[in-house]
Amino acid sequence: MITLKEALKYSKEELENLKKELNEKAKKEKKLGAYIEQFLDKDLSVSGEGVPVAIKDNISVKGWELTSASKILQGYIAPYDASAIVNLKANGFAPFGRCNMDEFAMGSSTASSCYGKTLNPLNFERVPGGSSGGSAAAVAGGLALASLGSDTGGSVRQPAAFCGCVGFKPSYGRVSRYGLASYSSSLDQIGVLTQNVEDAAILYDAIAGYDKMDSTSANIEFIKTAPNLNANEKLKIAVIENYVNDADTEVKNALLKTIDMLKANGHEIVYKNLLDSKFDIAAYYIIATAEASANLSRYDGVRYGKRSENIQNLKEMYVNTRSEGFGEEVKRRILLGTFVLSSGYYDAYYIKAQKARAFIKAKYEEILQDCDLIFMPVTPTMAFKFDTQKSPMQTYLEDVYTISVNLAGLGGISVPVAKDKEGLNISAQLICKAYDEQTLLDGALSLEQMIKN
């Protein structure tokens, strides 16, 4: 598969041929389930001219159906382009194909989609991760040059690690959320999934920047990263020792070898510890579900999306529409969020979680005052099998090493570093100071080149 960098040099005719080739591949690989539209006998949606980039089903593209992989939004046509899509088109790219996802971005396996599950291109018995599993599977499976996803607690980095591609979540506010279907407004961030680090920088440069349409957009200077990439920069990297040691044996061993390579290549390695990850899990799921319960209250059968036909009055319309339209995981999180915001529990849970969030952020900032980057696992395990019986709590633990990055509002990237004997991917995660994506991408490029060599 050609890279984004190479495709940007293509003529208009060559790009049209590339899109036809990707269409044919997508139709042949329907079983993978990376694209939502691939179960239909028609071409993938395309919007505008340019290098094709696959788009997650929660990012608005004018004229395209946007469902967040939920029955409740089926039939809703986006009336405008998300700001990230506007920027994408302005920089020579074209939205191309809707990628499958966990319903409303709530999940770690892309198994909760109303369209059916997505498979891992490395092993069809394994999950691709989530919630941007379709975006990761499309890139890793050779059905897309690159894709856009969203990352609320690891939803770009974790599927990238499971499928074996690069997943990059910028700092909170660096890419506009205008036009992104909200899950948790203080945590959501659009990110990129690509074949390599340089492509991640190119695609990030195309979508990043201040946007007056998003009140949480960071109004600070943005300098393009791709032209300034430097893999030779020697960095001080903090290894989170307790997280590396707590990972499964194969993941731990691969990361220890990677740390040795970083040392051998002239990077300064120091060892630090972060809080027990159980605090991250508790704070994240209280804050995320509380915000989700408010954000998803708009789906009531009145304004847009599906409306239940089994109704006698207004109350039944609300109750039946939401009961029929939402999947089990979404209902679970709405109920949890409503509970923690209810009278008598708000102070006990929500306020306490916000205090824990501030403490988590302060701990990251303390380490990054003295270091350029942080190094730790993306996930504690490799991609698990679909038939693995996991409780909701066990599934939530798949994001144990990624959610704190969102709580702190920092940038993070997942870079493949090893394969196990079955060919499953193992990735390392690098984390930067807020808005220091240049250093993050420099470090990631250095790591990538080390592994390739």
UniProtKB/Swiss-Prot annotation:
Source species, domain of life: Bacteria
Enzyme class per UniProt: ligase
Gene3D superfamilies: Amidase signature (AS) domain
A molecular function (GO) term: ATP binding
An example Gene Ontology CC term for this record: glutamyl-tRNA(Gln) amidotransferase complex
Protein's UniProt keywords contain Transmembrane helix: no
Active site: K56 (charge relay system), S131 (charge relay system), S155 (acyl-ester intermediate)
NCBIfam families for this protein: gatA
Sequence similarity: Belongs to the amidase family. GatA subfamily.
Protein name as it appears in the record: Glutamyl-tRNA(Gln) amidotransferase subunit A
